[in-house]
Structures are given as structure tokens and as C-alpha cells.
């Protein structure tokens, strides 16, 4: 396996200007050679059609694999221990598995995300949202109208508490889960900090699993524990990774969805008015948010199984590949006025939850959380408005997900 030519661009590990970066990269085409943290080269897929082609299921003749054994740099020893993205590629579970093993692992967790199970979670999510809004009201009254960070107080707590309820996370472990999930997405922190927080997260997951073995409940973790060993793939190691993946996939990305939808509506008051008047659906807002502000950012990692041509680029066997879901959502070859937020547009196509074999299993849960949280927020606070110039609100750290570092707002008038 050989590595392709040196990268033309450096992928900013802080992710501070993701949209500007995408436009600079796109000048070189839909497939761009970049340098990841630590100097490791990779391709970034920016084109919608190229991403769909790359992510197609090809059981007999795959172009790419999730198996790190196909990465030339890793096999050659050029990836140091502690490299910040390594944890996205080496853990044994759904995220890194190829068919047919991926199907077995996906089927293990799938019962937690059936329409009936998701429907049963609806009242739990409604209560979580109502409680967060009450906490915000109390905090706002105590702060005498000062600026509130809606991301910290609402956008992120709703999904992490929902995931906690789904998995049965004990209260005493919730803080460790939160810090560990944050570390996985922050590509700007030091490797030592990332490893420490990630290690603490894995330890907390093991503790939770041990408790469920001793005293199972009515949650996803308990269901997985009860079926350990029923298939060769259903091992304790894979169970731990399935729990970790559920936390990772369901936490910050869903928080970013709520964050970006609020930001989009507050910066496009004409569309907010249309939603409030019932002229535009919350489903349309959510789909357009997922296209306009892809919440998954640059998702690592896939590896070329063989040499192939895509989007004018010559991919070599062993090359690493990231998919820019922000870039695919703003592909001008696919979307008219791609940079415009417009929930009335005719097409709702987006790759916000991926495509193909690894399409997000928890997508219906994420959509439900947003559909509960957004109308409840705007109904409770009809005077909600941004407290800073939108252009000065920074992005969240790292290039893996796409949200804001903070979402400063004035809550305005409260509706009882």
C-alpha cells in the first residue's frame, strides 16, 4: 500500500471557520487532499454525488473500509500512539465494522430505535425539555435578564439527558460521560487531555455495565447485557463500544442540530414567522438545518481498499478519507443557493445522518428530540433573540462536529 501525493491544504483542527475552509477547498474540486492533525494526509469529500457514491454498499467489491488495517500510514507505523483521531478508528464496534459484521452489530442495538421504542421515549423527552425550560426560567430570574448561553443550558442538556434515559446512566456517572463525549469531538485539545477523558469515559461505561449485570433495568444497556454471547459478535468489548457509540452519536450531534436550528431561525426571522404561523413545518426546518449546517462536520475515518477515481481525484489504496457533511450540504452542483437557509425549498435531500450501511441508527430519535425541543422553546420564549452579532459567535472547537462554542441569547418575555 502506498500513500498519495502531499496534501495541498491543512485541515484546521480548531474548526473556527468551517464554511470559509470548505469554499477554499472546493476550488480544487469535490475531492480534496488535506493534512490532518499530526501531519497525516487524507482526502476530504465535499461533493454530494461523490459522497453518495463513496458510501454505497458494495459487499463484494467495496471501494472503502472502516477497518484500520487498510490504512497505509497506520500499517507503516506513521501514526503515533495517542494521535487524537485514533480513537475513531481502533475501537471494535458498529462504527468501525464492515459488512457482514456490521449488520450483526447493528441488529443488536436496533431494537432500541424501533418506532415503538422511540414513541415510548416521547413523554420522557417532553419532560426533559419542560424541566430544562423551567431551570432556564429560574436562572434567568436570578440573573435579572442577563445573557444566557442557550447551548450550555438547553441545546446540549436535552440530548445528553435523553441518552442517559435511553442507556440507564446513573446520576453519579453522568458528569464523566459528558466530559468524555466532549473530548471525542474536540480535535483542538492536547492528546494527553483527550486520552485522560476518554479513558475516564470508558471506565464509567464499564462501571455502568457491571451494575446492569448485577441489577438489570428497563434500558438499552440492560437489554444488551441480557443478550451477551448469543452471537459470536456479542462480546463484552463490543457491548462497551456500542454504549460509547450511542453516547457519541446521540449527544453533540443532536445538540448541534438544536443549536443550529435555533441560530438559523433567529437569523432568518421571516422563516421563524412562517413556522409560528403554521406555514412551514418543523420537519422542514430540521431537514433544512441538516443540509445548511451539517451537524457532523468532517467525519473520520474510512480507508481506500483499492485504487479508484472519484470526482477527478485519483485515490490510492491505503488512503484515509473523511466525509464533510457540511460540504456535501452546500454543494452548488446539487443545491440552488446552497448557502441560503430556506426551509421552503422543494428538495429536502441531505446527508445529515449519513448514507448507506452506516446511516445513523439513532436518526429518528434525534429528529424527535428536535421536534419536541424547538417548538417548546419558541413557545415558552416568543421574544427569544440573539445577544451578540451572529458573525461574532464562535464555532465549537474541533472539525468533527459543527455547532457553536456558545449560543448567547436574551430570553425575552416568558409565556406561562
Where in the sequence are the language-model features?
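Cytochrome P450
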Residues: 1-416
Amino acid at each position: 500500500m502506498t500513500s498519495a501525493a502531499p496534501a495541498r491544504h491543512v485541515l484546521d483542527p480548531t474548526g473556527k471557520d468551517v464554511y470559509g475552509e470548505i469554499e477554499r477547498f472546493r476550488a480544487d474540486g469535490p475531492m480534496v487532499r488535506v493534512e490532518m492533525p499530526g501531519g497525516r494526509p487524507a482526502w476530504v469529500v465535499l461533493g454530494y454525488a461523490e459522497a453518495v457514491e463513496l458510501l454505497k454498499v458494495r459487499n463484494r467489491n467495496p471501494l472503502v473500509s472502516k477497518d484500520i488495517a487498510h490504512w497505509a500510514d497506520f500499517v507503516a507505523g506513521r501514526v503515533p500512539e495517542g494521535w487524537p483521531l485514533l480513537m475513531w478508528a481502533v475501537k471494535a464496534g458498529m462504527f468501525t465494522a464492515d459488512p457482514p459484521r456490521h449488520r450483526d452489530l447493528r441488529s443488536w442495538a436496533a431494537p432500541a430505535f424501533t418506532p415503538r421504542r422511540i414513541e415510548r421515549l416521547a413523554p420522557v423527552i417532553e419532560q426533559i425539555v419542560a424541566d430544562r425550560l423551567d431551570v432556564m426560567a429560574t436562572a434567568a430570574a436570578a440573573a435579572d435578564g442577563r445573557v444566557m448561553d442557550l447551548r450550555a443550558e438547553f441545546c446540549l442538556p436535552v440530548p445528553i439527558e435523553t441518552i442517559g434515559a435511553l442507556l440507564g446512566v446513573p446520576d453519579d456517572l453522568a458528569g464523566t460521560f459528558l466530559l468524555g463525549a466532549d473530548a471525542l469531538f474536540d480535535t483542538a485539545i492536547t492528546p494527553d487531555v483527550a486520552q485522560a477523558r476518554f479513558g475516564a469515559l470508558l471506565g464509567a461505561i464499564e462501571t455502568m455495565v457491571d451494575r446492569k449485570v448485577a441489577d438489570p433495568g428497563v434500558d438499552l444497556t440492560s437489554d444488551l447485557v441480557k443478550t451477551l454471547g448469543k452471537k459470536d459478535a456479542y462480546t463484552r468489548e463490543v457491548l462497551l463500544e456500542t454504549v460509547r457509540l450511542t453516547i457519541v452519536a446521540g449527544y453533540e450531534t443532536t445538540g448541534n442540530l438544536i443549536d443550529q436550528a435555533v441560530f438559523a431561525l433567529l437569523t432568518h426571522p421571516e422563516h421563524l414567522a412562517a413556522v409560528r404561523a403554521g406555514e412551514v413545518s418543523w420537519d422542514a426546518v430540521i431537514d433544512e438545518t441538516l443540509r445548511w449546517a451539517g451537524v457532523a462536520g468532517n467525519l473520520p475515518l474510512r480507508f481506500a481498499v483499492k485504487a479508484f477515481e472519484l470526482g477527478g481525484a485519483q485515490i490510492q489504496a491505503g488512503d484515509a478519507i473523511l466525509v464533510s457533511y457540511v460540504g456535501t450540504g452546500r454543494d452548488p452542483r446539487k443545491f440552488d443557493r446552497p448557502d441560503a437557509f430556506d426551509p421552503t425549498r422543494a428538495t429536502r435531500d441531505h446527508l445529515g445522518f449519513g448514507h448507506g450501511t452506516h446511516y445513523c441508527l439513532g436518526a429518528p430519535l434525534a429528529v424527535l428530540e428536535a421536534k419536541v425541543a424547538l417548538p417548546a422553546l419558541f413557545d415558552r420564549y416568543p421574544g427569544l433573540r440573539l445577544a451578540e452579532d451572529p458573525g461574532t459567535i464562535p464555532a465549537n472547537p474541533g472539525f468533527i462536529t459543527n455547532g457553536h462554542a456558545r449560543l448567547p441569547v436574551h430570553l425575552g418575555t416568558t409565556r406561562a
